[in-house]
């Protein structure tokens, strides 16, 4: 897209010359090659600029930057462009208000010149100002001498110690603060790691629970209804819009309660084994029958026996018989008495427990039938409880 410019010739005709100013390469207004004729000879011009040179700023009759890179308004020849001499730029003059090199720091003026108000407080003026009770309250603690006699000025060490005794200790060492925070951070990290491992137990128990409803197949939650259609997924990972989400939350809640109860039982059994429950242990090597007055079962065990036993008081003619029983039995008895004393409605459950104990053969038959029915997949059913087996083993051995 060339720029057109109409050039008036001497015989009165106008010739439209494409790109006459030479803004594009290989276009110059050189009269020697018929630039202003009908047939300009662009290809035989030996003074054509190449494209790499076309990007340079030309120097012409109007100074640098005012002429096209392929010739000026008056043609290509140097006579038409004029001669321009390029002079090197003079360096900037050196600063007159600065000397080379680092200068010495000027001497600090004396205090009497910079802070004349500080020189007004000499020793005599200061002691006179201390006679004012308002000024004395700033320098002496409450309860000090209120007489006109001024105490001698304390030394620097005693003054600093008195100031710290009133306003507090100096700033503590940051290294001790960092070491104090390191321990709790490590405990928090270990607790978070254990929590992530413990949270996998409810998920495994939930998978086992839901697998009981899908015998012989993979558990799949359809999750299809008119309000919230969702895709098929596992019943242990229902989204909130799934109808089975509330049942999943209920199962997880029951599982958490079960784990909490199991941990509580383990803790109480451990306390009973350590002799910290209010039971009456028997001294090793003593007789199981005592003829003295009945002892109360409220004293703490002294740890004299490896496996603490409990004292069961059975009054008979003013005497009691001490029967050693397992500590877990003592724990159950203690827990039942503690709960019955605080919840009176638990006494209504005694007939039901006695009736259930009479159905023990039926219960055993039910357990045998369940083992026969789920025998092939017994390992899959018990696999969520594998992390709990070491705890049960320790309880079985040491209690």
Swiss-Prot record:
The places in or outside the cell where this protein is found are: Virion membrane
User: Where is lipid attached as N-myristoyl glycine?
Assistant: 2
Instruction: Give residue ranges on the Intravirion side.
Output: 2-252, 202-252, 369-374
The region annotated as signal peptide is: none
Virion surface compartment: which residues?
2-180, 274-347, 398-399
What are the recorded Gene Ontology BP terms? caveolin-mediated endocytosis of virus by host cell; fusion of virus membrane with host endosome membrane; virion attachment to host cell
Is Acetylation among the key words of this record? Answer: yes
Glycan-bearing residues: 319
**Uses, biotech or industry:** Systematic vaccination of individuals at risk of exposure to the virus has been the main method of controlling the morbidity and mortality associated with hepatitis B. The first hepatitis B vaccine was manufactured by the purification and inactivation of HBsAg obtained from the plasma of chronic hepatitis B virus carriers. The vaccine is now produced by recombinant DNA techniques and expression of the S isoform in yeast cells. The pre-S region do not seem to induce strong enough antigenic response.
According to its UniProt record, where is this protein mainly located?
virion
Organism domain of life: Viruses
Query: Is-annotated flag, keyword Phosphoprotein?
Result: no
Query: InterPro entries from the xrefs?
Result: HBV_HBSAG (IPR000349)
Task: List cellular component terms (GO).
Answer: membrane; viral envelope; virion membrane
Q: Where is this region: Pre-S?
A: 2-173
Q: How is it modified after translation?
A: Isoform M is N-terminally acetylated by host at a ratio of 90%, and N-glycosylated by host at the pre-S2 region. Myristoylated.
Tell me the segments the record calls region Pre-S1. 2-118
The residue ranges flagged as biased composition, category Polar residues, are: 95-105
**Keyword annotations for this protein?**
Acetylation, Caveolin-mediated endocytosis of virus by host, Fusion of virus membrane with host endosomal membrane, Fusion of virus membrane with host membrane, Glycoprotein, Host-virus interaction, Lipoprotein, Membrane, Myristate, Transmembrane, Transmembrane helix, Viral attachment to host cell, Viral envelope protein, Viral penetration into host cytoplasm, Virion, Virus endocytosis by host, Virus entry into host cell
Please list where the region (Disordered) is annotated.
Answer: 85-110
HAMAP family registered for this protein in UniProt:
HBV_HBSAG (MF_04075)
Domain comment, in the record's words? The large envelope protein is synthesized with the pre-S region at the cytosolic side of the endoplasmic reticulum and, hence will be within the virion after budding. Therefore the pre-S region is not N-glycosylated. Later a post-translational translocation of N-terminal pre-S and TM1 domains occur in about 50% of proteins at the virion surface. These molecules change their topology by an unknown mechanism, resulting in exposure of pre-S region at virion surface.
Family per record:
Belongs to the orthohepadnavirus major surface antigen family.
Q: What is this protein called?
A: Large envelope protein
Please tell me the species this chain comes from. Answer: Hepatitis B virus genotype E subtype ayw4 (isolate Kou)
